[in-house]
Amino acid sequence: MGPLSRDAWAQRLGAFRASPSAFMAGPEGEDLGRDLLSDLRSEKLSEQTKVSLLALSMEYPAQLWPDASAAEVAATSLLDTLVLLPPRPSALRRPLLLAATTALAAGGALGPTSGASCRLLPLLLGLAAGSDLGRGFVPASEQRPLQATACECLRELESCKPGLLGGSLGLLRGLLGQEGPVQPLSLLLALALRNTLVLQSRVGAGLGGLLTDKVSPTGGGPWDWTLVEEGDGRLQPQAPSWPAAEEGEGERSLTAREHSPEEARELRAAVIQLLDTSYLLTPVAQAQLLWLLGWALRGLQGQPPALFKPQLVRLLGTAQLTLLHAMLALKAAFGEALFTAQDEALLLRRLTLAAQHPALPPPTHLFYLHCVLSFPENWPLGPEGEEAAPLLLGPQLCRGLLPSLLHDPMALLARLHLLCLLCAEEEEEEKGQLPSPRHYLEELLAGLRQRAALDGGPRALATLCFQASYLVACCLAGQPTVLTPLIHGLAQLYQARPMLAPHFVDLLDQVDSELREPLKVVLRQVVVSRPGRDEALCWHLQMLAKVADGDAQSATLNFLQAAAAHCTNWDLQQGLLRVCRALLRAGVRGGLVDLLQVLARQLEDPDGRDHARLYYILLAHLAAPKLGVALGPSLAAPALASSLVAENQGFVAALMVQEAPALVRLSLGSHRVKGPLPVLKLQPEALEPIYSLELRFRVEGQLYAPLEAVHVPCLCPGRPARPLLLPLQPRCPAPARLDVHALYTTSTGLTCHAHLPPLFVNFADLFLPFPQPPEGAGLGFFEELWDSCLPEGAESRVWCPLGPQGLEGLVSRHLEPFVVVAQPPTSYCVAIHLPPDSKLLLRLEAALADGVPVALRTDDWAVLPLAGDYLRGLAAAV
């Protein structure tokens, strides 16, 4: 089939982008990558269409090249297309370089044994160096763009394989001083330098002459794959993340590293060279460069952080957020070794003033507030109980950062966090100056509670109030002077608006005991002081179920007895029973017995009466420890026919599909060789009774068509199950791995899913016999098949070892269904049909004591290595 037209490709790409997985599983998915590579060389397609094809290959490399071999083939084809381009300017050179790099990196094919890698790496290094590659390969008008693109490609490969460019440091350093794209070269050199320093420290080696050696980009290659293997592809993080600058790398990269005086001098010169040209870079690139160099030099002996001082002076007044973030990352990395006290005070003042600018958009405003909050000197550095470092952030400095009810919620919470930092300081406030931070905090919280208490007020106001209360409780947990008014204020809020009970329950679940226990006492007092016929009875019962315990038993029971007469619907009755359950677990007995007897007789709902009767029986027959165990969370799944599920497990868990250990085992049975398709015979075995079992199978790659699920109504342990038949639809005759997923229902009614061990389809599992020829025509039939394989097919000869069973035993055990002509015990002709449309023919003749020569013919050359491995392994197969 010839190349597709532009419209046909547009339609095909549109269908692919709409659903890549569905397209690749369809009939056109298998040929998409091959057609794309082929049509890139077609003269009928415009360059614009080819660029769109290359863009697709860069966006979806995993779908187009699913494994390393496919990625290797794709990269080789892309490089061939690049070489075949005419010497005139073309819009395809840069996309082809990027596409080849993406294919190798994403497909996992980059390595010393990859032919495409050995072609691409010298090409990229030569382009980055601006070398003359001959044959007018790089037109003059494309010199700088291609040089920049080559640097970007090398940076991507260095990121995938850290240490790859360790031998090119001297060359890259020399290129930085020449005319060329400064930004790509700077970032490439910084990344390669960072990776090399970290990896060399792991093996205890120095830089040697790496920073001074000028290797030839077209020579044998400066690639150090041993250093790449040491890196193992896991040098993270690649982006600024402070204050834990090296959290992802671990302690090994933080160990002090010392170089020889000559190495230290060359390293210092390289870093200074990069820093001196950093002002030519964009703000984002400058930030990345500073981060890479900061991480590289942190922990290096003989490399003072003062190298960054000129950049620090330049950046202290920057308005670029990315550069400010990079500067704070340097502060987190080097601390006082780079920043003086004056620098820290100036930087903090700069942050606080910038955060007060009225024209800042909300994200920028929150960023400045986050920087102020994360400023290292704003946090106590000593352990609890010891004197901590004083805060640089004082009331005078952050006067304009105090929170107000007029701020939006996120800004208010961030400013409230700052206010909590001020309140945590125990320094006395000077009279006549600002009001006390704690007094301001109490007024702010009172205002938030007042807004949350408004009847009909928006839910967001109540949510903000509880978020602020939680933040204060976390920051000031050890200060009773703050927590006491907070507790009483929250109690007044509940008294004014009981419908906020769910918020209180959530707050009690989240806070520590310093706030939780006294708040529970106050809330219980508020609830039991209300009349039992209150219109907010449902909220009171919900709150009481959370705060009820063994204290104040009489007041709680009196409230419940008064409320029982007003619990006329199912919701209220269930709420009342939940409070009784909480009292049972708390060890309350006494008057609870009488209350449960009354409820067992008077409740209208039969389910409620059953609950009350059950609680009464448990209370009468179990001691307190056993009662707590009986009413506690159960590890066993309860029966689903009762609403008791809502108490022990919840309806949500009963209705959701839960992940669970596999309760079914799956094994492969004997191979079935009948029918038009190969069929796997599966033998299931259940560990527990399961129902409505559905087995789903997924084949890695595009080797087979999607497999249908297999359904089993019931499986029980100890009871033999019927074998399951799984038809296979191979798209090519090759072994495969089947991932198995089980979905089933347990005897308790829960729906669970589990991943089973994978199943492996062997080459022999695909064998099918040809139709049996008429009697006496077997030899002619086989010879006709034998001759039809050539010249398009392939043939080979293999030595097949024989075990003690001899040739006749080997054939009868493994190949008997496929024998067309037999002259036992010395000669056999075997014809095997391999779906979808291939054949494998074997002649086994002149057997010796230890083996037999086998002549093979097939119309599919890819079958030969599989057939050879299969025949050589027959003797070992028992």
Curated annotation (Swiss-Prot):
Annotated segments matching region Disordered: 234-260
One Pfam family named in its UniProt record: AP5B1_barrel
GO biological process, one term: protein transport
A Gene Ontology term for the protein's cellular component: late endosome
Keywords annotated in UniProt: Protein transport, Transport
InterPro entries: AP5B1, AP5B1_barrel, AP5B1_C, AP5B1_middle, AP5B1_N
Basic and acidic residues compositional bias, start-end: 250-260
Residue stretches in coiled coil: none
Superkingdom field: Eukaryota
Subunit-level organization: Probably part of the adaptor protein complex 5 (AP-5), a tetramer composed of AP5B1, AP5M1, AP5S1 and AP5Z1. Interacts with ZFYVE26 and SPG11.
Role this protein plays: As part of AP-5, a probable fifth adaptor protein complex it may be involved in endosomal transport.
Entry protein name: AP-5 complex subunit beta-1
Organism: Homo sapiens
